[in-house]
Amino acid sequence: MMFKLGVLLTICLLLFPLTGTALDGDQLAEHMLDISSGINDRWFDPVRKCCMRPVCTCPCCS
């Protein structure tokens, strides 16, 4: 009985892998919002695409 359940579980995981599940519909939009949120910052320099703060630890400013 346990062998049959193990075989069934293996077949199900092969047919429907957990990493193959679709993302939420709004997940990409939220990610793009996080990326573009720095554009509205008053310290943001659009030419350098980085902040102009006096003490900046961003990798693009160093």
UniProtKB/Swiss-Prot annotation:
Q: Which UniProt keywords apply?
A: Cleavage on pair of basic residues, Disulfide bond, Secreted, Signal, Toxin
S-S bonds? 50-60, 51-58, 56-61
Point out the signal peptide segment.
1-22
Disulfide bond among keywords: yes
* GO MF, any single term: toxin activity
A cellular component term, taken from the record's GO annotations = extracellular region
Q: In which tissues is it expressed?
A: Expressed by the venom duct.
Presence of keyword Methyltransferase: no
Q: Pro-segment residues? A: 23-49
Transmembrane parts of this sequence? none
Q: Where in the cell is it found?
A: Secreted
Task: Copy the domain comment.
Answer: The cysteine framework is III (CC-C-C-CC). Classified in the M-1 branch, since 1 residue stands between the fourth and the fifth cysteine residues.
Query: Hey, which family's this protein in?
Result: Belongs to the conotoxin M superfamily.
Which protein, by its recorded name, is this?
Answer: Conotoxin reg3.5
